[in-house]
Amino acid sequence: MLNEIFKNAKSHMDKSIESLRRDFSTLRSGKVSVNILDNVRVDYYGTPTPLNQVGSVIAQDATTIIITPWEKPLIKDIEKSIQEANIGVNPNSDSECVKLFFPPMTQEQRKEIAKNARSMGEKAKVAIRNIRQDANNAIKKLEKDKSITEDENKKALEEIQRYTDEFVKKCDEMLKHKEEEVMKV
């Protein structure tokens, strides 16, 4: 029964870390990443569709992304979706593709992105702590139901705390790395 609680808690904490990793990938850093477009949806025959499913999206260099739609009539819809996504860039297009030219980030923009990263990191840590609380409640319920002894309860709570400390430390390390990446000129 305890092993199930441990496994469940660790699995949910892993998912929180993965979610944070995905969130960080959408933040712009020194060089442009195609992941900044992950949340852009294009109206494809009436269905909001991820941009990478209607064309190829590649980073040409540190400041340029090129989107080549598989169907040329989608170029206008792609432009519109990018403008609505408000990612700080205006699309340029020709008959073949859409080009996004990202200007170098100002210090103020870097600070704002770092602030967003800290907010995302804090949300992940709160999620991990909530998972710990749920696991602790389940363990205490087992002791109350006399399924485990007081000593087993104490050891189990310590184990959950070790998991929590480990995953919070991962969040902090990821945040530190992302802040360094964003602030690097």
Swiss-Prot record:
Predominant localisation class: cytoplasm
SUPFAM superfamilies for the chain: Ribosome recycling factor, RRF (SSF55194)
Annotated GO CC locations: cytosol
Protein name listed in UniProt: Ribosome-recycling factor
InterPro entries, sorted: Ribosome_recyc_fac (IPR002661), Ribosome_recyc_fac_dom (IPR023584), RRF_sf (IPR036191)
Function: Responsible for the release of ribosomes from messenger RNA at the termination of protein biosynthesis. May increase the efficiency of translation by recycling ribosomes from one round of translation to another.
A Pfam family recorded for this sequence: RRF
Residues spanning the membrane: none
Alphabetic keyword roster: Cytoplasm, Protein biosynthesis
GO molecular-function terms, A-Z: ribosomal large subunit binding
NCBIfam families with a match to the protein in the record: frr
